[in-house]
Amino acid sequence: MQKLNKHLKKKKQKRKKMKKKLNNEFQEVIDFLKSLPEGRRVYIEMSGIWIEVTKEEAINYLKSKINEKEA
């Protein structure tokens, strides 16, 4: 029973670490988008189609993806 608890605890910690890494990667992209000049074209891929969006729309899309992954 103790081995199972240790295993589950390790697995939970690993999942938490991976989630944090993913959030950091998303945050790096968001920071990059924020640094772009106004009027710069930004394209995102949604369901295999590339769509031109504003900088703010791209940031909001990434934030929604972060929330989706956390759920």
From Swiss-Prot:
Gene Ontology annotations of biological process type: protein folding
GO molecular function, one term: unfolded protein binding
Signal peptide: none
Pfam families: Prefoldin_2
Any one GO CC term of the record: prefoldin complex
Segments of this protein annotated with the region Disordered: 1-20
Protein name: Uncharacterized protein MJ0647
Organism lineage: Archaea, Methanobacteriati, Methanobacteriota, Methanomada group, Methanococci
